[in-house]
A protein has these predicted regions:
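Patatin-like phospholipase
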Residues: 1-7, 15-271
Length: 271
C-alpha cells in the first residue's frame, strides 16, 4: 500500500492504520465510548456554546497516534475537510496531505474532518472554518488518483452502496461495504456502546474475510454462495452477541452477590 486517505472517522482510521500496529488500533476503538463522543465541557455551557467538547477525542489522539512516527514512516496520508462559507455552510472540499503539517495542525485537521454539524464546533485552520470531510467527499479518492495511483481499495460504511467510478475510468477498484445496515446517524454513526462496537468489529471482520475470496482472489463458486454466506455470518454474529451479553450479565450478578457476601462478612467480623 503506497498511500491512504480518509474522511470523518475514516481520517482517524487512516492515522491509526498507518501506525502499522493492529493491536494499538483495536485498543483505541475499544476505549472510545459514549463519553468520548458526547463529552460535555462546563466552560462551553457557561459561555452558551452549545456543542460537545473535543477534549476526550484529543486525549485519544495523544494516547494512540504518534504524529512524528507516522510522518516519518508513511508519507502519503490525505484527509478531506469541508471548508465553510460566510453562512457556515460547506462549500468546498479540501484534501490535506498530513506530512506537510506540524503535529498541532494535524490535530486540527483530524478534528475538522470529524466535526459533525450541530454536535461540534467548526475548526479554524489558517483563518478559515472547516467541518466534517464526509459532508462533501466521504470517500476521498481524488487526491490519490492525482498522485498517479490507479488501483484502489475503497472501504465504506453504507450497506449495499455501489461506487460511482465515472470520474476515474482508467482506475481499478475493489470495494468493501457492510453486508448489513449499520444504522443511521444516531443509532449507527454515533453509537459507541459496547454492543454496537462489538457488532461492527465482528461484521467488518467477516465481510473482509469473504472479500478475500470474492474480490481479491475471486472464486466463482464462493461468489455465487456469497449472499448465503453473508447471512450465515450475520446469524453467527448475533448469536455470539447474545452469548456474550448473557455471560456478562451472569458475571455482573455473581460479582454483585460476592460483594454483598463480603459486606455481610465484614459486619460479623466487627461483632
Amino acid at each position: 500500500m503506497t498511500a491512504i486517505s480518509g474522511a470523518s472517522i475514516g481520517a482517524v482510521n487512516a492515522m491509526l492504520y498507518s501506525m502499522n500496529d493492529m493491536e494499538r488500533m483495536y485498543q483505541a476503538w475499544n476505549e472510545i465510548d459514549m463519553d468520548t463522543v458526547f463529552d460535555i465541557d462546563l466552560n462551553m455551557l457557561a459561555e452558551k456554546r452549545m456543542y460537545f467538547s473535543r477534549n476526550e477525542m484529543l486525549a485519544m489522539f495523544e494516547k494512540y497516534i504518534d504524529m512524528e512516527k507516522i510522518k516519518a514512516d508513511f508519507r502519503d496520508i490525505y484527509v478531506s475537510i469541508s471548508r465553510l462559507n460566510e453562512t457556515q455552510q460547506p462549500e468546498q472540499v479540501e484534501y490535506r496531505r498530513l506530512e506537510d503539517y506540524d503535529a498541532d495542525t494535524i490535530r486540527k485537521i483530524l478534528l475538522a474532518s470529524t466535526a459533525l454539524p450541530v454536535m461540534y464546533e467548526a475548526v479554524e485552520i489558517d483563518g478559515k472554518k472547516y467541518r466534517d470531510g464526509g459532508l462533501l467527499d466521504n470517500e476521498p479518492i481524488q487526491p490519490l488518483y492525482d498522485l498517479g495511483i490507479r488501483q484502489f481499495i475503497v472501504i465504506g460504511m453504507r450497506a449495499g452502496k455501489v461506487l460511482n467510478t465515472e470520474k476515474w475510468l482508467d482506475a481499478q477498484f475493489i470495494t468493501i461495504y457492510p453486508s448489513h445496515d449499520l444504522g443511521d446517524l444516531i443509532d449507527g454513526t454515533l453509537n459507541f456502546t459496547g454492543r454496537a462496537k462489538e457488532f461492527r468489529q465482528m461484521l467488518g471482520e467477516k465481510d473482509a474475510l469473504r472479500a478475500l475470496k470474492t474480490k481479491f482472489h475471486p472464486d466463482d463458486l464462493y461468489i455465487r454462495m456469497e449472499p448465503v454466506l453473508a447471512q450465515n455470518d450475520y446469524n453467527d454474529i448475533m448469536m455470539q452477541l447474545r452469548v456474550n451479553y448473557t455471560y456478562k450479565t451472569m458475571e455482573n450478578r455473581v460479582n454483585s452477590n460476592i460483594e454483598k457476601f463480603n459486606n455481610i462478612a465484614k459486619k460479623y467480623e466487627n461483632l
